[in-house]
């Protein structure tokens, strides 16, 4: 399991401005070249803000859970917990097999109750006590740039499609029908900066400092 803490800013820009930024970034050697991937997130809540990647629309302090898949690779699913507290975002994530995801969809949660990784135990409580269920499937056509320092990211969402209508058989399918949420010729840009916190904060929260630069490139 890995943990991250960071700050982020989001905005919607015209596609022409996006192209100008991309041209500039490609000229800057401090940025790694970036490909475009499709990131599917199965969120376990229905009321999400597409601009801020599932942070709740109406609440400043909130948590969200999702299962993430990149480029239709079902062999490398990720369970992700994203929390926002007074502007600071923390994210925990771990590997999830397709079989484990199917067990969750079937309502088989007990195996998570005594799991070694805390994110599974937290998710188990949310599923059993708060009755969280898969609520919306969102696909992001995403391009992520990471600076060489590994502490700053610039992420562009060229398309954001979603649906509330899915089944166990279609939830990971690339053929799942969805509705575009971005206006035409608009791009969502997100700037992320990893948080540098005092050592005692990591000790209090249990987050390991050595994992602070392991944010998945398209998360």
Across the structure, where does each feature detected by a protein language model lie?
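Phosphate-end processing signature that detects enzymes handling 5′-triphosphorylated RNA
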Residues: 1-219
